[in-house]
């Protein structure tokens, strides 16, 4: 149980932040408004995924 939770948590956090953040920064000032919208969506999606993964593990 410990190994599965650690692996999934670390992998999702690193992949999601690295890919999405890099794309927004490359576009520059034009992407400022888009960044705010994407940030809100990211939090909601992550919470839903975490709840589902915890339920399956139990």
From Swiss-Prot:
Keywords: Chromosome, Developmental protein, Differentiation, DNA condensation, DNA-binding, Nucleosome core, Nucleus, Spermatogenesis. Gonads. One of its GO terms (cellular component) is nucleosome. It is found in: Nucleus; Chromosome. GO terms for biological process: cell differentiation; chromosome condensation; spermatogenesis. One of its GO terms (molecular function) is DNA binding. Residues 1-58 are annotated as: Disordered. Its main location: nucleus. Protamines substitute for histones in the chromatin of sperm during the haploid phase of spermatogenesis. They compact sperm DNA into a highly condensed, stable and inactive complex. This is Sperm protamine P2. It comes from Bolinus brandaris.
């Amino acid at each position: 149980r410990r190994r599965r939770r650690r692996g999934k948590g670390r992998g999702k956090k690193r992949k999601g932040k690295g890919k999405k953040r890099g794309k927004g920064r490359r576009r520059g000032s034009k992407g400022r408004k888009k960044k705010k919208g994407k940030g809100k969506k990211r939090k909601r999606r992550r919470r839903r995924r975490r709840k589902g993964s915890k339920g399956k593990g139990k």
